[in-house]
Amino acid sequence: MRNSAVNCILTAVAICDIGTMASYLVYIIHFVLRRNNLCAPTFTHAWLQFLLWHVVLSITLHTTSLWLAVAMAFTRRMTLRVAALNSYWQKPRFAWKLCFIIYFTVFILCIPNMLVHEISRVQGHSWRPSKVCKTFSKNHVEPIYTFMVSRAATVNNCRLFKLNIWMIGIFFKIIPCILLIFLSFGLVIKIRDAEKHRRKLTSVPSNASNDSKLLKKKKGKPDRTTLMLVVILLVFLITEFPQGVISILCAIFTTDVHRYLYFYIGDVLDLLSLVNSSVNFVLYCVMSSRYRQTFWEVIIPSWVYSQMEKRSVLKTEESQPELKNTKHLG
């Protein structure tokens, strides 16, 4: 799976998706499913620390995944343009260097996001356990914590706060989405050109030999890798572009967007991020036979996988009588 640049970048994207989904899993279990737990406080200082790191980590990993998608589309575009075996764009070493540069750059750009918010105690409010809870004393009280905009972010007319929002909207969302649009169009054009070329190859005269027919059929296979990448890039565009627009609106109309828009659709934006992270795995399995093969080798026991391989080989031999006849004639 890792013998090409595209597969290496897909591996890096999968690492980001795993981290994003794992962080969201803990967040949903504690802050959503167990929010009404009467015997355990939800907004403690420790859990607010986790929530702060969850926000920073999810933004960092999700942005890294988006820029890796741009790198993947660019690498595939250059590979198709060069059209040479063992080109520089196809080497895993180049892909891993590119992934490391993206990881490091996004991490540096996400540093302001760590400085924007701070944990503060809610004055005048405290958490008290329910009367049915026997693990606490009768007059047990714990403080409630929440997020506040940090003092460093509010100085100089909220310069750091606005800079962070503009950076999220432009560098983390809009610019990679625009690049994905142009690269996706370029890949679609390449797919159409390859499809025209494939039709020319598969238009074999009726009096042609079996060897030439099989050769034309082999050369005329569609470029499934490029098609899979285009579908993945479209998913990124559908899920990320609306978030970029809302981030820019939030930078322009900060108070109004937070009060009247983001408060109501914040969960929808989080859902789009989760859909983007989860749908990639489905697309890999549906559109890549090599990915499916590797997935079954890892998940299924070896003796079960060997039986599946034998049945697959038998079905392939039964469905290709023409190939057998050609071999006997040779």
Model-derived features: where do they sit?
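Class A GPCR helix-loop hinge within the 7TM core
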Residues: 60-100, 286-288
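Helix-to-loop junction signature of class
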Residues: 19-39, 58, 62-66, 106-125, ...
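Class A (rhodopsin-like) GPCR signature focused on the TM5-ICL3 interface and adjacent 7TM helical core
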Residues: 68-82, 112-122, 168-205, 227-250, ...
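Non-transmembrane, juxtamembrane loop and terminal tail segments
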Residues: 199-214, 299-330
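Seventh transmembrane helix
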Residues: 177-183, 227, 232-248, 264-318
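Extracellular TM2-ECL1-early TM3 structural module of rhodopsin-like
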Residues: 5-72, 86-87
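Intracellular effector-coupling site of seven-transmembrane GPCRs
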Residues: 8-16, 98-100, 132-157, 185-243
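Loop architecture of class A 7-transmembrane GPCRs
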Residues: 34-55, 60, 87-88, 108-174
